[in-house]
Amino acid sequence: MNYFKLYRTPHGHVIQSSNSDKSIFHQASSWDDFINQENLFDACASAFAHGTEVNFGDIHLLHPVDQQEIWAAGVTYLRSKVARMEESKDSGGDTFYDKVYSAPRPEIFYKGNSHRAVGHGGKVRIRKDSAWNVPEPELTLFINSQGKLAGYTIGNDMSSRDIEGENPLYLPQAKVYDGAAGIGPCLLVTDQALAPETVIDMRIFRDGIEVFQGDTQISQMKRTHAELVEFLTREMSFAKGTYLMTGTCVVPDYPFTLQSGDRIEIQIEPIGTLIQIVA
């Protein structure tokens, strides 16, 4: 598979290629215009060939979200269904998750925008009114303004499990708040779909000690990427494109909860690693 890594910076884009060790700076158009070109892979190839080489270590990275919305799909893995049923059984909400896992229509909800997004090296937040907070590592799709899957990045769907478990209708409060949408570090643009064997790996460190590690393959998803894209774009248009987190099954078990200062590392190759600190 050939690919380009597209990084957003304050002054333009930095592009890396699977066939080179160079980092190339490109400043020909806005982020929104560039990523919504009809053939983004070819656009990256052209920009890489005609740009200026830079030292990647000197680059200040921004999250890959400008005017895009961020959406998320839930209960797309079996383990996610089981976990959601367990956390919500006391409220009687467990049947909701059982039904949505097998239903024709997936769960899709609004996650945030550029204002609420946190990029690589940034600080994600946990709610002050929640006692059970976890990160959820998710392969995230970029869907362009034509409604086509055009790239991939890494998502960290910060979640307040006790709030969601209390009542499924509280999901927007459990999932959508300032600093709850981790995303980055780049937009991966490929010449073919990611392999089913692609691994999502998450590690959490506290005071320098690893306190959680979990991983899965995207082949464990019940729903296809095409299916999720079709449902999201069925009655909605996105003039600047949109991001769609695709769900997770790698979540720390109760009673683990995040604390301020925890370091979250989510790796999905060949995208890279998204590293964030809990504020």
Named regions from a protein language model:
Residues 4, 128-129, 252-254:
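Generic recognition of flexible, low-complexity loop/linker segments
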Residues 10-11, 17-22, 143-148, 205-208, ...:
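Short acidic-glycine loop/turn motifs at beta-strand connectors
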Residues 1-3, 8-12, 136-137, 193-200, ...:
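A short, compositionally biased
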Residues 19, 154, 215-216:
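Short clusters of small/polar residues that mark proteolytic maturation junctions
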Residues 42-208, 227:
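Active-site microenvironments in enzyme catalytic cores
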